[in-house]
């Protein structure tokens, strides 16, 4: 999808499609249908196909990196599997929805981040106004996807792709949470992840009004369960083959190596107004 620089309506856009044996051939075929010379310097969003495996994701990302600049400004998503194909008629709405999601959640997966780690890559998957996180194992050509909004947002924060929590917790907790989030990782022997929450809004979804302290306890318990689940899913029980959340990095810096299963714990800090 491109903006039409010749249109008096600045919101106007056009969709061009092409097919080919490779991503580059398809891109070139689409470009040939345009009137005028395409300019890629203002590209700000790339959407990978639903179910995209790592070789295809890598091929698309490398093509974008060699064609469009500046690459770090291009946000990357994996397409929501629920989006009906073909998407030509839905493209403007899809673009608007993804940009709105990016702004609301303060989420940004830059194109360059797909190449920051040789063993793994993390990309958000749009999911009906929410997102999941998809972790590619680039060596094994496998992928794992988070299963809950809270797990996805914790993973995105740990990856440095997000700085905000905004989700409804599982049904049995009847709780919604919003907060700005900062993360600090320490490695005194095991990995300790300090998550500081600022401007916190905890909303009780039950008819009763539970005190804030009770809501904080419920949220902390849910966050720790999801964090433990992430560590188990992404690092396994026999020691990590990759470091998708960059947690082993801190242990390696301090001790030179990591041995055995990763031991990590999450600690929440509630920032109150007026505190530094």
Predicted ranges, named:
Residues 1-276:
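Membrane-proximal alpha-helical signals and transmembrane carboxylates
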């Amino acid at each position: 999808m491109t903006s039409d620089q010749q249109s008096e309506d600045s919101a106007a856009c056009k969709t061009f499609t092409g097919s080919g044996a490779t991503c580059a051939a398809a891109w070139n075929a689409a470009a040939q249908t345009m009137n005028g010379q395409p300019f890629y310097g203002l590209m700000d969003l790339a959407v990978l196909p639903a179910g995209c495996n790592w070789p295809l994701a890598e091929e698309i990302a490398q093509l974008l990196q060699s064609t469009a600049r500046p690459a770090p400004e291009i946000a990357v998503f994996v397409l929501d599997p629920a989006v009906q194909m073909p998407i030509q008629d839905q493209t403007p709405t899809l673009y608007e929805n993804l940009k709105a999601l990016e702004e609301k959640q303060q989420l940004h997966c830059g194109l360059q981040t797909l190449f920051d780690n040789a063993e793994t890559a993390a990309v958000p998957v749009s999911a009906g106004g929410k997102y999941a996180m998809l972790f590619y194992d680039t060596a094994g050509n496998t992928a794992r996807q988070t299963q809950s909004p809270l797990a996805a947002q914790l993973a995105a924060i740990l990856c440095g792709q997000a700085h905000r929590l905004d989700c409804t917790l599982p049904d049995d907790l009847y709780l919604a949470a919003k907060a700005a989030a900062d993360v600090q990782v320490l490695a005194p022997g095991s990995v300790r992840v300090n998550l500081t929450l600022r401007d916190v809004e905890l909303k009780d979804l039950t008819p009763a009004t539970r005190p804030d302290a009770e809501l904080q306890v419920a949220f902390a318990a849910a966050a720790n369960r999801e964090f433990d689940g992430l560590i188990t899913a992404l690092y396994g029980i026999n020691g990590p083959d990759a470091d998708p959340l960059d947690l082993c990095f801190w242990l390696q810096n301090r001790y030179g190596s990591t041995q055995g299963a990763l031991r990590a714990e999450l600690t929440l800090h509630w920032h109150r107004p007026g505190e530094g």
